[in-house]
Amino acid sequence: MIAGLKGLKLPKDPRSSVTRTATDWAYAAGWMAVRALPEFAVRNAFDTGARYFARHGGPEQLRKNLARVLGVPPAAVPDPLMCASLESYGRYWREVFRLPTMNHRKLARQLDRVIGGLDHLDAALAAGLGAVLALPHSGNWDMAGMWLVQRHGTFTTVAERLKPESLYQRFIDYRESLGFEVLPLSGGERPPFEVLCERLRNNRVVCLMAERDLTRTGVEVDFFGEPTRMPVGPAKLAVETGAALLPTHCWFEGRGWGFQVYPALDCTSGDVAAITQALADRFAQNIAAHPADWHMLQPQWLADLSESRRAQLRSR
């Protein structure tokens, strides 16, 4: 999917096409402005914006999500955590806008020193069956992808189609410029699952954002003690191809980055629901360790959906 934009709701009225065009223009302007300004000026502007949006409690859904992570009522989520979370989210977008013009070789050398668990990825590729890296929306996953391209070549991911098409294409062009192979979730020449299986059988790497799928295709899991749904794609790919399913986590360390690849999950049972639950458990441990860097501003749990939406999910 297009990282960070899943769940974007645009008005369904005659003006929606105008709104979508304006959204596209806004992202285009952001890309140009952030690249043109000095880093310190951009950082100060984004951090000021985060502090502004954190005033008066910050976004309600973000507060609800962090409350689950901390195990407290929403009102008890500390205001400094809300501010830090919004600053982290702003930093992600700031780096997205600047990443295409940064020195990727230099960045990769810097990241070589901080990425943990690379032996798990190396072992998966040495086995010749490919690797599925499954990540939550935390830290800067695009930065991790850039490193992966520099060290292991192109990997394959999937993007949800956005509207307008020009905005979707803008993000596709951005990620392809970093060396990613991006498959459309819908509307492609071949089903993405078929192509992903083919890549894995060729001992390639597949990367998927994997902690949220509030649709009928998602499988129900326990996440921080409450039911939600997560995508079955990572588990199904591992079962179908024999590829290693490697939970992966990204976070920020000061002005640097933290990345960790974890041991492969046991997929020998072929039980997609159980494997996805194991993935959810790993995600929960990592998000709890770095709550400010989990960029989830949309509903994550079934309890936060409307009754009509929950009824639709139950009617599958």
UniProtKB/Swiss-Prot annotation:
UniProt membrane topology term: Peripheral membrane protein
Biological function: Catalyzes the transfer of a palmitoyl moiety from palmitoyl-CoA to the 6-position of the mannose ring linked to the 2-position of myo-inositol in phosphatidyl-myo-inositol monomannoside (PIM1) or dimannoside (PIM2).
Subcellular location as annotated: Cell inner membrane
Known EC number: 2.3.1.265
Key words, A-Z: Acyltransferase, Cell inner membrane, Cell membrane, Lipid biosynthesis, Lipid metabolism, Membrane, Phospholipid biosynthesis, Phospholipid metabolism, Transferase
Gene Ontology molecular function, alphabetical: acyltransferase activity
Catalyzed reaction equations: a 2,6-O-bis(alpha-D-mannopyranosyl)-1-phosphatidyl-1D-myo-inositol + an acyl-CoA = a 2-O-(alpha-D-mannosyl)-6-O-(6-O-acyl-alpha-D-mannosyl)-1-phosphatidyl-1D-myo-inositol + CoA; a 1,2-diacyl-sn-glycero-3-phospho-[alpha-D-mannopyranosyl-(1<->6)-D-myo-inositol] + an acyl-CoA = a 1,2-diacyl-sn-glycero-3-phospho-[alpha-D-6-acyl-mannopyranosyl-(1<->6)-D-myo-inositol] + CoA
This protein's pathway: Phospholipid metabolism; phosphatidylinositol metabolism
UniProt superkingdom: Bacteria
Entry's transmembrane regions: none
Family membership noted in the UniProt record: Belongs to the LpxL/LpxM/LpxP family.
Positions bound to hexadecanoyl-CoA: H137, R175, E240
UniProt enzyme class: transferase
Name assigned to this protein: Phosphatidylinositol mannoside acyltransferase
BP GO terms, sorted: glycolipid biosynthetic process; phosphatidylinositol metabolic process; phospholipid biosynthetic process
Claim: Glycosyltransferase is one of the keywords in the record: no
